[in-house]
């Protein structure tokens, strides 16, 4: 028995052979590609974090500006927990790094899925990714420059006069972060509508008929994503409704382009069928003639098979008659003049007659 080579190179070659034989090379290649894309995204966020870390306090001051401008004179934000003055700016720096790196992260996602798409799909996805990024930043900017001043101006004066308004920095960061991402994703409504129309899930006419329900859903989404105050709910619901109408308007152009492309494909297919009609007819005729010739030759083979089966049946019946009559009847049959033992075979001129043993003739007088 030969010893198995247990060296690392042999194990590596053996694993490569197994991967190649089992067809897992493509799957492992996708996993390696996904790992590389994720590492690039993490490295990009880490580099941005290191660049922004020295400015962590300035970032928090800029983020707190919409609230600071509406706070009563002499009021400041507080830190309830001991480590909050250090960890809250650190957390804000990490979130800012992710926020800035969104275009690069989307590009890595696009680079991973693009090789598996058709050419027309790649032409469609690239503008959608670009528009999604722009709309996300527009939603965040809308929250910072429009929603925050209105909401904080209302909340700072809505409480009792004898209550000191001093928000916690941790709660404030959670509040504004949720609004940032909520408005960023809400501004993706036009992209979602266009995708649904392109895929064929809905049509622009159906979306127009669904308008009243869309308004109700907009207020429900705003109630879920925003803090529990009516003003911020309206501040989110109204943009959702406007973006729904904008997406409906844009989707009509994509729907018309989709119908035109489908008509062109159908026309090309019908034109190709017309151009090749003569050749197709000739090919069909030749195919039918070959089939007819084959069917004409088949009965000869069938007759031969039937004759062979009939011969086998006669042999089986002869053996069965010999075993039933016994040796005495066979001897008596051989001593009769001009008499042969009955084999029960069918007449040759009646191939389709049922196979039954022919009756014995009466003994001739001596």
Swiss-Prot record:
Membrane topology listed for this record: Multi-pass membrane protein
Answer yes or no on keyword Chloroplast: no
Q: Which residues form a coiled coil?
A: none
Record field: compositional bias (Basic and acidic residues): 281-290, 301-318
Annotated region (Disordered), positions in chain: 266-366
Q: Which GO terms describe its cellular component?
A: TAT protein transport complex
Q: Where is the composition biased (Polar residues)?
A: 319-333
Q: Which Pfam families match?
A: TatC (PF00902)
Entry keyword set? Cell inner membrane, Cell membrane, Membrane, Protein transport, Translocation, Transmembrane, Transmembrane helix, Transport
Q: Where in the cell is it found?
A: Cell inner membrane
Q: What NCBIfam families does the entry give?
A: tatC (TIGR00945)
The entry sums up its family as follows: Belongs to the TatC family.
Q: How does it assemble?
A: The Tat system comprises two distinct complexes: a TatABC complex, containing multiple copies of TatA, TatB and TatC subunits, and a separate TatA complex, containing only TatA subunits. Substrates initially bind to the TatABC complex, which probably triggers association of the separate TatA complex to form the active translocon.
Q: What is this protein called?
A: Sec-independent protein translocase protein TatC
Q: Which organism is it from?
A: Halothiobacillus neapolitanus (strain ATCC 23641 / c2)
Origin organism lineage: Bacteria, Pseudomonadati, Pseudomonadota, Gammaproteobacteria, Chromatiales
Whichever gene encodes this chain, its name is: tatC
């Amino acid at each position: 028995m030969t010893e198995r080579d247990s060296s690392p190179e042999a194990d590596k070659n053996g694993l490569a052979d197994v991967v190649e034989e089992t067809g897992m090379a493509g799957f492992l290649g996708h996993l390696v590609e996904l790992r590389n894309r994720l590492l690039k995204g993490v490295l990009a966020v880490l580099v941005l974090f290191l660049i922004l870390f020295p400015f962590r306090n300035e970032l928090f001051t800029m983020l707190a500006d919409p609230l600071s401008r509406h706070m009563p004179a002499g009021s400041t934000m507080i830190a309830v927990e001991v480590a909050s003055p250090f960890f809250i700016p650190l957390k804000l720096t990490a979130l800012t790094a992710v926020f800035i790196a969104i275009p690069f992260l989307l590009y890595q996602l696009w680079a991973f899925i693009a090789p598996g798409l058709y050419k027309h799909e790649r032409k469609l996805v690239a503008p959608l990714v670009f528009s999604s990024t722009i709309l996300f930043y527009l939603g965040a900017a809308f929250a910072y420059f429009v929603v925050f001043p209105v909401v904080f101006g209302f909340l700072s004066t809505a409480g009792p006069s004898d209550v000191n308004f001093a928000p916690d920095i941790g709660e404030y960061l959670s509040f504004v972060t949720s609004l940032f991402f909520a408005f960023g994703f809400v501004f993706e409504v036009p992209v979602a509508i266009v995708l649904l129309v392109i895929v064929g899930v809905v049509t622009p006419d159906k979306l127009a008929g669904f308008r009243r329900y869309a308004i109700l859903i907009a207020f429900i989404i705003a109630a879920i994503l925003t803090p529990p105050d009516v003003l911020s709910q309206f501040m989110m619901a109204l943009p959702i409704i406007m973006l729904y109408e904008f997406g409906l308007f844009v989707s009509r152009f994509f729907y018309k382009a989709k119908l035109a492309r489908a008509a062109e494909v159908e026309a090309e297919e019908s034109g190709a069928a017309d151009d090749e009609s003569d050749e197709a007819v000739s090919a069909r005729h030749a195919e039918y003639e070959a089939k007819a010739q084959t069917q004409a030759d088949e009965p000869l083979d069938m007759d031969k098979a039937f004759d062979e089966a009939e011969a086998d049946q006669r042999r089986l019946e002869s053996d069965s008659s010999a075993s039933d009559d016994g040796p005495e009847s066979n001897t008596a049959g051989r001593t009769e003049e001009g008499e042969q033992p009955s084999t029960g075979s069918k007449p040759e001129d009646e191939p389709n007659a049922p196979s039954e043993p022919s009756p014995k003739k009466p003994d001739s007088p001596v």
